[in-house]
Amino acid sequence: RQYHIHCAQGEVGRYVILPGDPGRCPSIAALFDNPVKVAQNREYTTYTGTLLGEKVSVCSTGIGGPSASIAMEELHQLGADTFIRTGTCGGIDINVKSGDVVVATGAIRYEHTSLEYAPIEYPAVANFDVTLALRQASENLGYRTHTGVVQCKDSFYGQHSPEKSPVYYELLQKWESWKRLGVKASEMESAALFVVADALGCRC
């Protein structure tokens, strides 16, 4: 079994949904046919079932790039090759409203996990086929959908309450830059997952 997620060969599908919160896994798994709880350890809870005859899984990752990259690495060891990160984000673009769906095409690498896999010059870009499928699915379901770049960070409170930080001036200046550049939203996993997926030869 894998050291952190506690899953073994044959227990996960090629396609894996990656929420942060373990509490969301049962709700996602309920959409599968014949879902089975495979493992639970630390922040990692995994269910596997089928969709349209294809074996699929959901595995929670906790918050942030380090734990998310561990999940992707270990799931890849078990044969997973296509990942969909799902979770909450905070809007940056004024046009992104509460309840809208944001499909990330790429991410600002304002985090450090991805630096263990690629130099900072390497872009954190989503897989085109996965991005296109997600956007089409969201629109077909009738959601207000935004597609574009997101900001990926390591500190939740440092970014949401920058005025409290000793480096508030830098945080506020960069936040204004993200807005002017049309960045859609802010979250904590995408940059790491996009870069790790490229390093492993996966899709995300």
Model feature map: region roles:
Residues 1-133:
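Metabolite-binding pocket within alpha/beta catalytic cores that recognizes anionic/polar moieties
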Residues 77, 167, 199:
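Expand to "…catalyze enediolate/carbanion chemistry for C-C bond making/breaking, isomerization
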Residues 174-204:
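A C-terminal functional module that forms or caps the active site or interfaces directly
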Residues 22, 90, 151-157, 192, ...:
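Glycine-rich beta-alpha junction loops
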Residues 125-182:
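Active-site rim beta-loop-alpha module in soluble metabolic enzymes
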